[in-house]
Amino acid sequence: MTRAVRVLLVDDDALVRSGLRMMLAGAERIDVVGEADDGRGVLGAVDLHRPDVVLMDIRMPQLDGIAATRLLRSQPDPPAVVVLTTFDTDELVLRALRAGAAGFLLKDTPPAEIVRAIELVHAGDGMLSPAVTRQLIALVAGEGGAPARHDGARELLESISPREREVALAVGRGLPNADIAAELHMSVATVKAHVSRLLVKLGVENRVQIALLVQDATDASR
């Protein structure tokens, strides 16, 4: 039997944490193992509870979710982070993803979609709500003042094998591993192996950052 995904809730609002806990209690493959009420408590809570996935609010009083995500992702063998917030401004989305978040969802996202996001990031996929995905692509495509980053991204994509590039481009379109496997006629295990190699070769932390790099490379080619 597959082990349940261990989840840590991080939000300064006790009512929000309680609501999330109640909602996730109905998901049989998810186990809420702990809570923290501020970004400063994340490292201690992670050490104590050893979660697989952290659901992280952005706006918190002492240490916000973006700084906490960056701090957490700098640790050895960190859990995946899904940012869950009422705010979906362009700047917040991009800052959270560049900090290492594997997903960005709004708090009004349907419960089933939140559960799916947790399961996807635990399996190594990324997760963005459709509205946030559209914003992100538009934002990165329109970012100015970063030609060096765009050129660097293009050079990185040119340095990998053609098959790895196909996988990277599919990740950049937001496809999960199963869809990439079907499209490129390979097994899911092979896709996972390609993604793992891409993380190392491209120097990024997760598949969402692969998608950001792909978009940067696309901008460099325009």
Report the location of each language-model feature.
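Short, flexible helix-to-coil linker/hinge segments that flank and couple to helix-turn-helix
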Residues: 93-98, 108-162, 166, 216-219
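Receiver (REC) domain active-site loop signature in two-component systems and cognate sites
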Residues: 60
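Recognition helix of helix-turn-helix DNA-binding domains
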Residues: 173-209
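Active-site residues of response regulator receiver
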Residues: 57, 85
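Short amphipathic alpha-helix used as the core "switch/output" element in two-component signaling
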Residues: 44, 66-77
